[in-house]
Amino acid sequence: MSFLKDLEEKGYCIIDNVLSQEEVEISLNSFHEWFNSYSQIKESHNKVSPHGIFKFFEVGHQRHAWFIRTRPAVLDVFKELWKTDELVVSFDGSCYIPKDLMKKDNIWTHADQAPSKKGLMCYQGFVSLTENKERTFVVYEGSHKLHEIYCEEKKLTDNKNWLLIDHDYLDKIKDTKRVLHVKAGSLVIWDSRTFHQNQYGTLPEDRIVQYISFLPKKQRTSKMFEKRFKYFTEKRTTSHWAYPVKVNGLQPQTYGNKDLLIDYSKLVPPKLDDLKEDIIKLI
């Protein structure tokens, strides 16, 4: 399949029409229903969510997230990637940048694989519910092949799965920078070694995506399962790594503003009963 070749050569791929138009509309409706279900979600989003990325408010376990994760076409792509029908999924968050929010872009290009990890370890991605030409995903083509070289050059050896890339290094590879045109219903996947970031751009576009990542179940230990099941029942949001699990905190950085503290007792529980059978298979 062409997307496998793209991932190997470019470090990323775009697969159009993974969700049907109907599935996109269902997901959008679910997202907006959740977003408007509690006033603090909307009021605090741009204050506590860097680059529009939701990490709080139990976002990783809302209906739109689980609906997308359990779509057969989404699963089929990752089954093909990992050559197995047995997968586990991350409890990752979403990104929402409304079209009326305009910000100056900063360079925060990074890789999500630690210097201590060599070779292909994880594919991460998102399903887009909006079409975006400029308020979108930025990637450096082929940079997954530079990850180990960069870490050796900078003498980096730590095991944190978040690696900020120096601006001077990015300038050397600027010709490989790609600003992706992503259509609604598309699945974007990248090797976790690939250098990437979001950008606001200059066009007033809504951007809504659900981050998504699967790993083979065969490497999930019983201890990992216990931890994952615990975080599922507690509706905790995690990083894009399905394992080892890295859970996000419950509260954002408030800088002394108590109004930003989240009252989880006021959140509306997601309705997942019709998806439960498929969800359990992915934990």
Q: What kind of region is each of these model predictions?
A:
Residues 2-9, 16-116:
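Non-heme Fe(II)-dependent double-stranded beta-helix
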Residues 116-133, 181-184, 189, 213-216:
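Short, conserved beta-strand element in jelly-roll/cupin
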Residues 19-21, 95-96, 114, 130-134, ...:
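Short, solvent-exposed loop/turn segments at secondary-structure junctions
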Residues 12, 120-126, 134, 177-179, ...:
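Extracellular structured ligand-interaction cores
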